[in-house]
């Protein structure tokens, strides 16, 4: 595999972007798209062809889990970084919805809109990466959480990173520039894969430093390690064993099924870690629930955390 091209990856797993990038092999039968050796079969439901049906169930299950997580985060009124974490989970919901669109054929790979939806998916995935890093740094309390300045900074950072990834991906897919076309994918590979991997590595390192040097308990370290395990396992199953899984499952599922499931478990571990390192003033929360208070402000707001306490 040459650095920056998707030939080897797309021959193993049926990523959505594989339908809109070109093979560096000039003798390929297709001018656009790289067909994997094995991919999950489509299913016809109500005269509608649905791709990746197993992956669709994982996405729907993930949406239900995310709604439960958001409900629990919203109920933890006084926890550190509550608003910023909510923003992260909202991004994940948007990412799952975009994945449903491109994975299940809501926008068919042959349509003109498909490249735009794939670019949106990559942009949302990148925005989620930079968002979780922001939340990780927020735990060190370098700035006030939940403030207007903090939230607008988070929104601007995520939007800018989304735009960068979206534009690079779209220009690559559409071949609008001679330096970036469907066969010259190095820039997209570096930005979408390499830089985002570095961002996630920084997040993990920062949280390990936080647990080791700032917390009284090492139990949250278990949530971090489990999250890393699920994430790495998902990447390995998606990019290395997708073909074996597909053949073993008679084309009903492939590596994307397990990759998506592992990503959901990773998000659950991120929530669990945040839940373990933050505490809530129970008396304050219950009192406000009884009185129907939905928003707090001013200096009298109580916030609790196990960090630097």
UniProtKB/Swiss-Prot annotation:
Q: Where does it live in the cell? A: Endoplasmic reticulum membrane
InterPro entries associated with the record: Chs7
GO BP: cell wall organization; protein folding; protein transport
Question: Which ranges does the record mark as transmembrane?
Answer: 51-71, 86-106, 114-134, 156-176, 194-214, 218-238, 251-271
Q: What does this protein do?
A: Chaperone required for the export of the chitin synthase CHS3 from the endoplasmic reticulum.
What protein family is recorded? Belongs to the CHS7 family.
**How would you summarize the oligomeric state and partners of this protein?**
Interacts with CHS3.
Q: What is this protein called?
A: Chitin synthase export chaperone
- Source organism of the structure: Debaryomyces hansenii (strain ATCC 36239 / CBS 767 / BCRC 21394 / JCM 1990 / NBRC 0083 / IGC 2968) (Yeast)
Origin organism lineage: Eukaryota, Fungi, Dikarya, Ascomycota, Saccharomycotina
- The encoding gene is CHS7
